[in-house]
Amino acid sequence: MSFSQLEQNIKKKIAVEENIIRGASALKKKTSNVMVIQKCNTNIREARQNLEYLEDSLKKLRLKTAQQSQGENGSEDNERCNSKEYGFLSTKSPNEHIFSRLDLVKYDCPSLAQRIQYMLQQLEFKLQVEKQYQEANTKLTKLYQIDGDQRSSSAAEGGAMESKYRIQMLNKALKKYQAINVDFDQFKHQPNDIMDNQQPKFRRKQLTGVLTIGITAARDVDHIQSPMFARKPESYVTIKIDDTIKARTKPSRNDRWSEDFQIPVEKGNEIEITVYDKVNDSLIPVAIMWLLLSDIAEEIRKKKAGQTNEQQGWVNASNINGGSSLASEEGSTLTSTYSNSAIQSTSAKNVQGENTSTSQISTNSWFVLEPSGQILLTLGFHKSSQIERKQLMGGLHRHGAIINRKEEIFEQHGHHFVQKSFYNIMCCAYCGDFLRYTGFQCQDCKFLCHKKCYTNVVTKCIAKTSTDTDPDEAKLNHRIPHRFLPTSNRGTKWCCHCGYILPWGRHKVRKCSECGIMCHAQCAHLVPDFCGMSMEMANKILKTIQDTKRNQEKKKRTVPSAQLGSSIGTANGSDLSPSKLAERANAPLPPQPRKHDKTPSPQKVGRDSPTKQHDPIIDKRISLQTHGREKLNKFIDENEAYLNFTEGAQQTAEFSSPEKTLDPTSNRRSLGLTDLSIEHSQTWESKDDLMRDELELWKAQREEMELEIKQDSGEIQEDLEVDHIDLETKQKLDWENKNDFREADLTIDSTHTNPFRDMNSETFQIEQDHASKEVLQETVSLAPTSTHASRTTDQQSPQKSQTSTSAKHKKRAAKRRKVSLDNFVLLKVLGKGNFGKVILSKSKNTDRLCAIKVLKKDNIIQNHDIESARAEKKVFLLATKTKHPFLTNLYCSFQTENRIYFAMEFIGGGDLMWHVQNQRLSVRRAKFYAAEVLLALKYFHDNGVIYRDLKLENILLTPEGHIKIADYGLCKDEMWYGNRTSTFCGTPEFMAPEILKEQEYTKAVDWWAFGVLLYQMLLCQSPFSGDDEDEVFNAILTDEPLYPIDMAGEIVQIFQGLLTKDPEKRLGAGPRDADEVMEEPFFRNINFDDILNLRVKPPYIPEIKSPEDTSYFEQEFTSAPPTLTPLPSVLTTSQQEEFRGFSFMPDDLDL
């Protein structure tokens, strides 16, 4: 639609509204009926509101037309002015001012245009759902009538009748909004689907608590009029939560109720309020509206924050007295100190009042009913999940970091499906039905479907390249691409790929001109080329193809397998199935006797025994292995998929699998029988010869390699003991080595051994040596070290090389001292949290103090934090390499079976959270700490590391008065300028808006956290606070930071720059990174070179009584016993291998 056509359309709608006003005014003059006059007044009021909206839309359209005709110069000037105002007076982008859903359903709605768009989508969806309800109830009525169940039939019929009335209401309301809607998609700045699709998860989260709702009165409702009754009918109001009736008012004929309800809610989402008229014995719905519990909770939060700000007298940046003028350093110090003292007195007075008034805060307003009328409601909601926190100065408290763990992945045709929660209505891209709350979504292409449907998806994920496809996989040769064209969406429809509701308008929607499916513009290239065919039909065809291929392969395999199996079974005098023959062919061979054993002993079957007597434990293990083999044979016989997979192995076994025995004539007998069976199947002769030759060669090589490994292992052990071990130690080691070989021979599958149990002191030292080399040089990777001889051929060569390596490095390894937890005395607990514990420890060798951070391996494995642990170690080494003055350095790291340990330098001055909670920081002191933190962040960013967990608890104070950043658990490397990541992590009050929106983000998130940190140091409270995480997140996304009205302009300026919600416009987000922040007027009297070289005297030096003084740490930590709970070893070899190379022992270690 062109601008001229759109302008004509708006003028027509304006004329309609003017006619409604004239007609209602004329009718009102000619009647004395009170009801008619009231209706006319309502029509006039609504028409004037619509008229104002249409005239405003016409002005916007003409302005846009003028801008296009004059060029873009004027718009660029306006944008430049807006960006200047945006940079200092507001931290929000002009496009971010979107009203909440609760604001849009209020009678005094701030934006009628947004309400029209929101209600059009909601009414379309409700209409579709109600039609489904009506259809289902109609079918149920007929079914119950057939069964003769009159009671259930009447209930279903009543439900169908109510759905009929609801559909009439919704259609009427939908036509009302469609009549005045103006489509501005040609020059729209903001997509319509922001209200739903891009809402963070917590915005529509199910809540638990107590809902307080007061229903006072209603007005302008179109009640049912009957000529038989002079009085208005009785009216009720019902309250539903997630389609369940929770409360109902008393009947009223004058639309006044004045009733209050307190409704306990358990994981509720949507509230429905419906007005019913009672006609005879039936209730007929006449008006309806919907609210979300999360919107009510957000409204209560804003109202509570507003009350607190009014009591404090704080304002946003645009109302600061100083404006943009920059005060002198002395003036800013005095002003801020005065403000801080005022804050202290105010916050101390209001802490108790804030707690007591939380449950009493409510919102009262007139809300719009559909299709006509308004209702006066008083709404309040108290969450039962709110955490009672100890209120300290300004409300600052400790909070652990959060991180989104990796979800379980379900793979299907290259898709990586994970289970996701959705709090708006989604549509399955496979079957087309609605999803309620949860579904399976591909991490790569965002394809969405039910859990029950994901196994039926036949289309490849776009992330799967052609080289990843299986050549034998069944394919559907239906390649008819869609013809997607831009189209205007006029109803509520869902994307056929990602399942989200499609926005209204033309820019973001595509429709296939052939088959009619619709999708987002960004999803069009992901939709498979199945034009004219549904997903379900494609799946049926593909399954038929797969079944046909499977049956054909089964027929080919059955005839020859049966013949050959019967011939072999007859020849051996036993009936052996092909699967058992395959099992025998693949079974490991018995070990060969050693060279010094002249005659084979019966006791040596399956092992090398040091004695000639039977060992009852060994016999028991052998019997258990036999029992396991029988279970495996039974499983193989019953598993068709396994038979398909092992078809080649079966054929090999059928021709060349002799009985395993020590009888040297057995092989000849079995070969003779095999030749006999081959004569009965001439068609397979050439293939069978090839298979038999390969198997015999494989057997010979295997026996030779096993014998060689045993000989080499014995010789190497002897060489290692020469000139270093006395006779007694040598005998002890010989006995241990023999036991090791016995255990190795007994264990048929040695995949669950523990490398940490297998290490002797020498191999442990070798591993430490290799680990330190690998970390410092970052060029050599540590090869696994193991003393066991593996029984699989692919592990034999590495074992030999590892043993040789241990012999070569023995002399050097013997000089390196081993460090373990036994080398330390554990003194006090310094802190604990999600990560584990930090314990003050003293070295037994040097009496040096250190802080040991202890992490449990099983927690790291369960939470998929292996990469985080590696990154933490890497950042520790980065800080230690240059001995950075403001970063915590690492002494060493080591591990046990169940834990890993970082031995760090002990910083005895406590963290800044303790100091801020116990003493207010002056501006000079806060600026000094901020400068040192800034230089630490600069070093991280210059080396491609983002920190992501900057907060007061992670900044420690040294005995000299300087700061050091600690806890590198959330750091990520390889984050240079322009690189992005998307992990949802951080401490709630410090998380940047782009993280909460689950967008990809850059190093700019550290500058947002730096702004929050500086705000807390100067004003002793958070710029964005709430009673729980969801409230904090909402505050970060929607609220402006507030300041004392007399705060200095330079302080406000740096806050506004760092706390800008748009990451591209944020201070420090450019290529110059920290240099932008260092050039701010706030730091103009700071010499950063002197700060870096510790030439500036700290403004505060903590009083530390002794090296072991922990008075600056929380007593709840230091009073806990410094012990580690014993843990059972539950990690497998593969899990332990994840921690290989973690240990770090520098050459100059002095512990």
Swiss-Prot record:
Skewed-composition ranges (Low complexity) = 792-806
Limits of the C2 domain: 190-309
Known EC number: 2.7.11.13
Any Gene Ontology biological process: regulation of nuclear-transcribed mRNA poly(A) tail shortening
* Pfam families attached to this UniProt entry: C1_1 (PF00130), C2 (PF00168), HR1 (PF02185), Pkinase (PF00069), Pkinase_C (PF00433)
| Keywords in alphabetical order | ATP-binding, Calcium, Cell cycle, Coiled coil, Kinase, Metal-binding, Nucleotide-binding, Phosphoprotein, Repeat, Serine/threonine-protein kinase, Transferase, Zinc, Zinc-finger
Q: Where are the zinc fingers (Phorbol-ester/DAG-type)?
A: 414-461, 481-531
Q: Which residues form the REM-1 domain?
A: 1-67, 106-183
Q: InterPro entries of this UniProt entry?
A: AGC-kinase_C, C1-like_sf, C2_dom, C2_domain_sf, C2_fungal_PKC, HR1_rho-bd, HR1_rpt_sf, Kinase-like_dom_sf
Where are stretches of biased composition, namely Basic residues?
807-816
Annotated positions binding ATP = L830, G831, K832, G833, N834, F835, G836, K837, V838, K853
Compositionally biased spans, kind Polar residues: 560-577
Q: Give the residues annotated as active site.
A: D949 (proton acceptor)
Q: Which GO terms describe its molecular function?
A: ATP binding; diacylglycerol-dependent serine/threonine kinase activity; protein serine kinase activity; protein serine/threonine kinase activity; zinc ion binding
Annotated Gene Ontology cellular components are: cellular bud neck; cytoplasm; cytoplasmic stress granule; cytoskeleton; nucleus; plasma membrane; prospore septin filament array; site of polarized growth
Consequence of mutating T958I? In cly5; temperature-sensitive mutation that cause cell lysis at high temperature
- Record's SMART domains? C1 (SM00109), C2 (SM00239), Hr1 (SM00742), S_TK_X (SM00133), S_TKc (SM00220)
Determine the domain of life of the protein's source: Eukaryota
> Do you know which CDD domains this protein is assigned to?
C1_ScPKC1-like_rpt1, C1_ScPKC1-like_rpt2, C2_fungal_Pkc1p, HR1_PKC-like_1_fungi, HR1_PKC-like_2_fungi, STKc_PKC
- Which reaction equations make up its catalytic activity? L-seryl-[protein] + ATP = O-phospho-L-seryl-[protein] + ADP + H(+); L-threonyl-[protein] + ATP = O-phospho-L-threonyl-[protein] + ADP + H(+)
Q: Any idea where the AGC-kinase C-terminal domain is?
A: 1084-1151
What does the similarity note say?
Belongs to the protein kinase superfamily. AGC Ser/Thr protein kinase family. PKC subfamily.
| Protein name, per record | Protein kinase C-like 1
**What organism is this sequence from?**
Saccharomyces cerevisiae (strain ATCC 204508 / S288c) (Baker's yeast)
Gene encoding this polypeptide? Answer: PKC1
